[in-house]
Amino acid sequence: MLSAAQLRGTQQRRRSPYSDKQYYQEYILQRIEGYKNSIGRDELLRLGDEAATELQTAAEGQFLLTEVLMLESVDRLIMKRLSLRPYSKWRRQFLKVREAQRTPTHWGLEPACPLARLLPRIEPRDVTLVIGSGAEPAAYLLAAHDAVVTFLAGDLGCVERVESRITAEGLGSLFEAYVAQTGPCLPEFVDFGDALGLVVLDPGVLAELSATCRMEFVADLQRLSRPGGVHVVLPSCPSLAPEALLAFYDGWAVEEDGRRRRRGGLARRPEGLVLGCPLCPPDTTREASTAS
């Protein structure tokens, strides 16, 4: 994820965006895997027999059937059954759909919401974490921008709903969702593979926790975030305002929106907090030696 300074500068992005061909290959693979998961074992075995027969007939016994050839042949048969569109037809529709998916309003978010302001800074495969049912739309929006998204919620129904829509929208290639109750730290089974560039938090997941537990949870999120990373705290919980968590972000910078005031100086409706992790962590060793 780019910093605000990098976005304003001329620095090139660290990662190139996906090509349309890559998106098409993902589309094909997702449809094939979805079909395999939707049929029973007997039907899958019949597909394998049909593929083996076709290979033997075409090659007239000139080569040995390998597992790779069999898998490729089965995939081709599934593509025929599904009547998947060729690349040229698929691309025309895909570009329109993806353009819509990348707008906040497509997911019910305000155009000027905190996450919308960060979208120009997001790069493909940025590692992001979205926590809480109130942050559900953020998971869709980030997935549409090719971020690696992990979604956590305490409600199984919410997680299943998000997984279903992600699949239906064709956004599931870099998406994982887990049922997880909020505690002093994130569950051990959640593995991000890299430091977090962006965290979107619905403070409602902290509403029932003690102040100490909230502090420990936020500290764990900070520990997992990379220098220069960003946390967005949404105004999604009536009983716990984003500002109530500010005390846990000592040393982090509050990123203000220059458009937060309307004409005449009237304050806009609260939209949440955007907090930036310092690029250089404090030198705790030096502080300890000074104190001693």
PLM ranges: what are they?
Residues 1-106, 286-291:
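N-terminal accessory regions of S-adenosyl-L-methionine
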Residues 106-126:
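Conserved alpha-helix/loop element of class I SAM-dependent methyltransferases that forms part
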Residues 135-147:
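Conserved SAM-binding loop of SAM-dependent methyltransferases across substrates and taxa
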Residues 161-191:
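S-adenosyl-L-methionine
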Residues 193-213:
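A short SAM/SAH-binding and catalytic strip from SAM-dependent methyltransferases
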Residues 213-229:
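A short glycine-rich, Lys/Arg-flanked "PGG" loop and its adjoining helix->strand segment in the class I
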Residues 227-237:
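Conserved beta-strand signature within the Rossmann-like core of class I S-adenosyl-L-methionine
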Residues 239-292:
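Class I S-adenosyl-L-methionine
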